[in-house]
């Protein structure tokens, strides 16, 4: 016989972890957020392995409420991650431009440009 109580415990743990991950994202602690992702996946897998008894409508309704809260947190987290990806994309673009400028000026090192050369 399957023990259904731990499954609801896992639901609560999943919700708590989703809040923690959201807090980490709001704080800009991206490395810590990534570290928590594996725990999140493991909790989801645990929930999938230990479903709530179909006849227990009380627990099913509680799980639905928790799931809705988790999904709201995931949607907000996804938005924050998209903003972070855009920030990183801009940093990468900026770094590429800086390298291009450095390379160009590096190629001109040792060359002296005189104003008379500009009029020709």
Swiss-Prot record:
What keywords were assigned to this record? Bacterial flagellum biogenesis, Chaperone, Cytoplasm, Repressor, Transcription, Transcription regulation
For this chain, the family text in UniProt reads: Belongs to the FliT family.
Which intervals of the chain are annotated as region FliD binding?
Answer: 59-97
Location comes to: Cytoplasm, Cytosol
What Pfam families does this protein map onto?
FliT (PF05400)
Q: Please name the gene that encodes this protein.
A: fliT
Q: Which InterPro entries match?
A: FliT
Q: Name one GO biological process term.
A: protein folding
Q: Name one GO cellular component term.
A: cytosol
Q: Which organism is it from?
A: Citrobacter koseri (strain ATCC BAA-895 / CDC 4225-83 / SGSC4696)
- Kindly provide the name given to this protein in its UniProt entry: Flagellar protein FliT
Q: How does it assemble?
A: Homodimer. Interacts with FliD and FlhC.
**What is the stated purpose of this protein?**
Dual-function protein that regulates the transcription of class 2 flagellar operons and that also acts as an export chaperone for the filament-capping protein FliD. As a transcriptional regulator, acts as an anti-FlhDC factor; it directly binds FlhC, thus inhibiting the binding of the FlhC/FlhD complex to class 2 promoters, resulting in decreased expression of class 2 flagellar operons. As a chaperone, effects FliD transition to the membrane by preventing its premature polymerization, and by directing it to the export apparatus.
Required for homodimerization: where is this region?
Answer: 1-50
